[in-house]
From Swiss-Prot:
This is Fumarate hydratase class I, aerobic. Belongs to the class-I fumarase family. The keyword Metal-binding applies. Keywords: 4Fe-4S, Iron, Iron-sulfur, Isomerase, Lyase, Metal-binding, Tricarboxylic acid cycle. Pathway: Carbohydrate metabolism; tricarboxylic acid cycle; (S)-malate from fumarate: step 1/1. The gene is fumA.
Length: 548
């Protein structure tokens, strides 16, 4: 084994950044000199302002390129009617959110900051605290949601009440700029991050593509497609792989080279990306309720690996694609330009709020009557819900289970009304509710049979596909699972939710049990009382096509 001469290879060699920025301020930066070199001095206030503005912008606006991809669905003759319906709701939602009152999604996310600090940038220390202060200011001052739970011991938790802590990862690099990527990462998309430990045997053209397609299928619709999907093959460690997945899904590595070299540079496999996008379109899942647009795009990145390891990572950025770059240089503080006018992407003929035909359901009547009406319609039927709905999510269900396990039974409200799996953002002044879109249904699957056996949770409303145990429970007890569109939380708050009040557990914040009154609240029948599951039917249809 001969020794090669030393050669340093930048692991992620990126081309020039062509991101469009706007100048936030030229204050809080100055130039100095040290040992003959010019130094950029950055005051702590600059970091706080940067973080505050970046997370504000990302909470209410998305990138123009993303909005264009959504708009393209409306003009695609191959898109299903459900694809187009969901895309239109996303654009309407963005149009409302861009006003800066109701955030794009009710899950305003964990604040993640990746910073690369040039060696000739001096701050005097305390960078993490200054950035965290900016995150704090955003979540306190805007109508966002506090989603972070702090453990008091291994089992007891309390909401931090500020959305802190933020995840802040800072790196030292060459140069005289301080560059950032800020991500507001919701729980739904974060939970669709996976690591698979494979071997060299996977690395053949015949095996790898089929493997990735099968993994992609497991994503389901719970994280609000259309997705930006990222696959990473290889990595010097498991954590390097998953870190690359996160950044790739945020388009941070789009300017990587498209071929490798003997020194181990990361690269994109553009051809495999195209092939996988076609496969995603053929899955049939579409933009949540069947169709073509399961994904907007796919990124596939290849990394070097240890000979004994072959990590494969998969992750997504969801329809709330909240990623934003920022930087500080000698001119001042710069923030990536997001789309301030998403309404321009809505075709003129679709600007009115009419939704076409939907079955109107009056929820202010006995549960037996509501169930009897739903039983008349097949899965995939679009509904317009009107009346009272109970709102509760993870901790609320855990509280209800405690009651059942203790022999206390269920409160009457969980028997009399449908339950919506959700947790509201803060309510702006003059509004009935803050942004209030659905959370992932699957996390509540284990509770359904026990609840329905006692007459509760007979109609469930949430987002995404569910497990077989829910289908079985609904068939056994005569229940239904209705799908709400994951993503357009601002549309629901402005157009459908007429009142919001806390029913129980106010100390739990967004995890409390709430009651809402709704008008024309859109939903689809996804699981019925006869054992039919909309998503299983799609899978069977696709399998039949494969056999043919």
């Amino acid at each position: 084994m001969s020794n090669k001469p030393f050669h340093y290879q930048a692991p992620f060699p990126l081309k020039k950044d062509d991101t469009e920025y706007y100048l936030l301020t030229s204050e809080h930066v100055s130039l100095s000199e040290f040992e003959g070199q010019e130094i950029l001095k950055v005051a702590p206030e600059a970091l706080t302002l940067l973080a505050r503005q970046a997370f504000h912008d990302a909470s209410f606006m998305l990138r123009p390129a993303h909005q264009q991809q959504v708009a393209d669905i409306l003009r695609d003759p191959e898109a299903s009617e459900n694809d187009k319906y969901v895309a239109l709701q996303f654009l309407r939602n963005s149009d409302i959110a861009a006003k800066g009152v109701l955030p794009t999604c009710q899950d305003t996310g964990t604040a993640i900051i990746v910073g690369k600090k040039g060696q000739r940038v001096w701050t005097g220390g305390g960078d993490e605290a200054a950035l965290a202060r900016g995150v704090y200011n955003t979540y306190i001052e805007d109508n966002l949601r506090y989603s972070q739970n702090a453990p008091l011991d291994m089992y007891k938790e309390v909401n931090t009440g500020t959305n802190l802590p933020a995840q802040i990862d800072l790196y030292a690099v060459d140069g005289d700029e301080y560059k950032f990527l800020c991500i507001a990462k919701g729980g739904g998309s974060a939970n669709k991050t996976y690591l698979y430990q494979e071997t060299k045997a996977l690395l053949t053209p015949g095996k790898l593509k089929n493997y990735l397609v099968e993994k992609m299928r497991t994503l389901g619709t719970a994280a609000c497609p259309p997705y930006h999907i990222a696959f990473v093959i290889g990595g010097t460690s498991a954590e390097t792989n998953l870190k690359t997945v996160k950044l790739a899904s945020a388009k941070y590595y789009d300017e990587l080279p498209t071929e490798g070299n003997e020194h181990g540079q990361a690269f994109r496999d553009v051809e495999l990306e195209k092939e996988l996008l076609i496969e995603a379109q053929n899955l049939g899942l579409g933009a949540q309720f069947g169709g073509k647009y399961f994904a907007h795009d796919i990124r596939v990145i290849r990394l070097p690996r240890h000979g004994a390891s072959c990590p494969v990572g998969m992750g997504v950025s969801c329809s709330a694609d909240r990623n934003i770059k920022a930087k500080i240089n000698r001119q001042g503080i710069w923030i990536e330009k997001l789309e301030h006018n998403p309404g321009k992407y809505i075709p003129e003929e679709l600007r009115k709020a009419g939704e076409g035909e939907a079955v109107r359901v009056d929820l202010n009547r006995p549960m037996k009557e509501i169930l009897a009406q739903l039983s008349q319609y097949p899965v995939s039927t679009r509904l317009s819900l009107n009346g009272t709905i109970i709102v509760g999510r993870d901790i609320a269900h855990a509280k209800l289970k405690e009651r059942m396990d203790n022999g206390e039974g269920l409160p009457q409200y969980i028997k009399d009304h449908p339950i919506y799996y959700a947790g509201p953002a803060k309510t702006p002044e003059g509004y009935a509710s803050g942004s209030l879109g659905p959370t992932t249904a699957g996390r509540m699957d284990s509770y359904v049979d026990q609840l329905q056996a006692l007459g509760g949770s007979m109609i469930m409303l949430a987002k995404g596909n569910r497990s077989q145990q829910v289908t079985d429970a609904c068939k056994k007890h005569g229940g239904f699972y209705l799908g709400s569109i994951g993503g357009p939380a601002a549309v629901l708050a402005q157009g459908s939710i007429k009142s919001l009040e806390c029913v129980e557990y106010p100390e739990l914040g967004m995890e409390a049990i709430w009651k809402i009154e709704v008008e024309d609240f859109p939903a689809f029948i996804l699981v019925d009382d006869k054992g039919n599951d909309f998503f299983q039917q799609i899978q069977l249809t696709q399998c039949t096509r494969c056999v043919k």
